[in-house]
Regions:
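Conserved ABC ATPase "signature" region
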Residues: 51-69
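Conserved beta-strand-loop-alpha-helix hinge in the C-terminal portion
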Residues: 154-183
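Conserved catalytic motifs of ABC-family nucleotide-binding domains
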Residues: 94
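ABC ATPase NBD Q-loop/coupling interface
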Residues: 1-14
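Conserved ABC ATPase signature
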Residues: 73-77
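H-loop/switch region of ABC-family ATPase nucleotide-binding domains
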Residues: 134-135
């Protein structure tokens, strides 16, 4: 369901414009050889005019700090830079919804943390709705509105971060090893206090 409509009723062009998707492996998403062209590719595919493309590409290069490597070959970029480029190229189309499928799984811890902070910034500054699948729960739980926890391919629980913490504590579930430190401490202490979910 997308804004109250079955997704099958939403045209492909509207889906392409309004629903952004970032893959797990940055190599599988890049389609051009130059950074600037990757930023423009989606807009070109949707038929935007040249002035609009240039404006949006410049906005994204500035917003994401890409201007320093704007003219580089994509092959020269690190994994973190490639994933950031994928995100910027999607955001150039101004999607309402951004879906990210384990976008940090190929990144080192510092690049992953930086990438997730950028996603958080997009949600906070631009208001884009984010759906994120992620194993780094300690990094995303504190800023999530709603969490769905999967375990062995099945939905274990869902709710606000605080409710997730309380559930996992009640169930003595090992998933707490990947939760933020305040939640881990909460799980180890006998109390009836609300679960802390913010760092």
């Amino acid at each position: 369901c997308y804004y109250g409509r079955d997704l099958k009723e939403v045209g492909h062009r509207q889906q392409s414009q309004e629903i952004g998707y970032v893959l797990q492996n940055p190599e599988n998403q890049i389609v051009t050889d130059k950074v600037w062209h990757e930023l423009a590719f989606g807009l070109e595919s949707l038929g935007y005019d040249t002035p609009t493309i240039r404006l949006r590409v410049a906005e994204m290069a500035s917003y994401f700090g890409i201007h320093q490597w704007f003219y580089k070959n994509v092959s020269e970029l690190s994994g973190g830079q490639k994933q950031l480029l994928n995100l910027a190229a999607i955001m150039a189309m101004h999607p309402k919804l951004l879906i990210l499928d384990e976008p940090t799984s190929q990144l080192d811890p510092i690049a992953a943390s930086d990438f997730l902070e950028t996603v958080r910034k997009i949600n906070r500054d631009i208001g884009t709705t984010i759906i994120l699948t992620e194993h780094r729960l300690q990094d995303v739980i504190p800023w999530a509105d709603r969490v769905y926890v999967m375990d062995k391919g099945s939905l274990l629980t869902q709710g606000a971060p605080r409710e997730i913490g309380e559930f996992l504590k009640r169930e003595h579930h090992g998933m707490f090893l990947s939760m933020p430190v305040p939640m881990q401490i909460y799980a180890e202490v006998e109390n009836n206090l609300p679960c802390p979910c913010l760092l």
